[in-house]
């Protein structure tokens, strides 16, 4: 059996030009949005990078350029579905995924189960294979000042 580990990280700053945020494919009511070329889903972006990294295929920016207008305001679930096809083509399967959302606000706990279900559905895996947790920075740094949100994701693949 062959194993591969990937790590992904993403961060987006808040903008008053949008309302509500999308994280893990779930829309969360909030007075600000996340600045991005796509929908700004920091969790899906980090997850894409983790899978691509484990496959040795670079990062999300290599496959979906942020200068390409076809990806302007696109639902990030599209990226994850395309990366799932790459995963299948390389004949790897997901063992597990572990995600950490770092945000002072809004609170993530009420939305985590919906995120897990959404991601499991796209990746065609069991919800039990995805863990999502959230933390704050205890009001330190740009996240603590509520200027943005970051995520880290680790995935383990096997074949």
Swiss-Prot record:
Pathway: Isoprenoid biosynthesis; isopentenyl diphosphate biosynthesis via DXP pathway; isopentenyl diphosphate from 1-deoxy-D-xylulose 5-phosphate: step 4/6. CDD domains: MECDP_synthase (cd00554). A divalent metal cation binds at residues 10, 12, 45. One of its GO terms (molecular function) is 2-C-methyl-D-erythritol 2,4-cyclodiphosphate synthase activity. It catalyses: 4-CDP-2-C-methyl-D-erythritol 2-phosphate = 2-C-methyl-D-erythritol 2,4-cyclic diphosphate + CMP. It is an enzyme of class 4 (lyase). Involved in the biosynthesis of isopentenyl diphosphate (IPP) and dimethylallyl diphosphate (DMAPP), two major building blocks of isoprenoid compounds. Catalyzes the conversion of 4-diphosphocytidyl-2-C-methyl-D-erythritol 2-phosphate (CDP-ME2P) to 2-C-methyl-D-erythritol 2,4-cyclodiphosphate (ME-CPP) with a corresponding release of cytidine 5-monophosphate (CMP). The record marks 37, 136 as: Transition state stabilizer. Its cofactor is a divalent metal cation. Its EC number is 4.6.1.12. This is 2-C-methyl-D-erythritol 2,4-cyclodiphosphate synthase. The keyword Aminoacyl-tRNA synthetase does not apply. PROSITE patterns: ISPF. 4-CDP-2-C-methyl-D-erythritol 2-phosphate binds at residues 10-12, 37-38, 59-61, 64-68, 103-109, 135-138, 142, 145.
């Amino acid at each position: 059996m062959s194993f591969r580990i990937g790590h992904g990280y993403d961060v987006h700053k808040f903008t008053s030009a949008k309302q509500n945020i999308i994280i893990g494919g779930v829309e969360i009511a909030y007075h600000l949005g996340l600045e991005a070329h796509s929908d700004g889903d920091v969790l899906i972006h980090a997850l894409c990078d983790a899978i691509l990294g484990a496959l040795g295929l670079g990062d999300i920016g290599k496959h979906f350029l942020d200068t390409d207008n076809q990806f302007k305001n696109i639902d990030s679930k599209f990226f994850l579905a395309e990366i799932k096809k790459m995963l299948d083509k390389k004949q790897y399967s997901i063992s597990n995924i572990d995600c950490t959302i770092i945000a002072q606000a809004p609170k993530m706990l009420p939305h985590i189960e919906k995120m897990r279900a959404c991601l499991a559905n796209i990746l065609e895996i069991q919800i039990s294979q995805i863990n999502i947790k959230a933390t704050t920075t205890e009001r330190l740094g740009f996240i603590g000042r509520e200027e943005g949100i970051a995520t880290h994701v680790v995935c383990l693949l096997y074949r």
